[in-house]
Amino acid sequence: MSGRGKQGGKVRAKAKSRSSRAGLQFPVGRVHRLLRKGNYAERVGAGAPVYLAAVLEYLTAEILELAGNAARDNKKTRIIPRHLQLAIRNDEELNKLLGRVTIAQGGVLPNIQAVLLPKKTESQKVKSK
């Protein structure tokens, strides 16, 4: 017999990516390959690329959320490098992490020294009260 019509044999389960197993959007397999090819260590454990992909995904989501808020504050629907710059520099922890990073087309934060601002006169102080 040719084996047609035989019931039996094991049905192989549908392949599931390591990213979907970990509940991530970032590619765990690609991170693992890059860790191996990058000569960071002789061997790479199974959990290392999952952890690194999760950290990268978290940082990306955090920056994109803040940049989206900056875009919305400027009444724009598209995130541009300026919004990324504003998001990173206005967040204390992200600014510390990316302090030495230059963002192309990012511009600078608006900042006027207090001594350069016009001084309040007595008449302005009375009006403001």
Swiss-Prot record:
Residues where N6-lactoyllysine is found: K10
GO CC aspect terms: nucleosome; nucleus
Coiled-coil portions: none
GO biological process: heterochromatin formation
Residue ranges, compositional bias (Basic residues): 7-19
SUPFAM superfamilies hit by this protein: Histone-fold (SSF47113)
InterPro entries listed in its UniProt record: Histone-fold, Histone_H2A, Histone_H2A/H2B/H3, Histone_H2A_C, Histone_H2A_CS
Alphabetic keyword roster: Acetylation, Chromosome, DNA-binding, Isopeptide bond, Methylation, Nucleosome core, Nucleus, Phosphoprotein, Ubl conjugation
Record PTM text: Monoubiquitination of Lys-120 (H2AXK119ub) gives a specific tag for epigenetic transcriptional repression. Following DNA double-strand breaks (DSBs), it is ubiquitinated through 'Lys-63' linkage of ubiquitin moieties. Glutamine methylation at Gln-105 (H2AQ104me) by FBL is specifically dedicated to polymerase I. It is present at 35S ribosomal DNA locus and impairs binding of the FACT complex.
N6-acetyllysine modified-residue sites: K6, K10
Biological role stated in the UniProt entry: Core component of nucleosome. Nucleosomes wrap and compact DNA into chromatin, limiting DNA accessibility to the cellular machineries which require DNA as a template. Histones thereby play a central role in transcription regulation, DNA repair, DNA replication and chromosomal stability. DNA accessibility is regulated via a complex set of post-translational modifications of histones, also called histone code, and nucleosome remodeling.
PANTHER family, A to Z: HISTONE H2A
Family per similarity comment: Belongs to the histone H2A family.
Descriptive protein name: Histone H2A.J
Gene field: H2aj
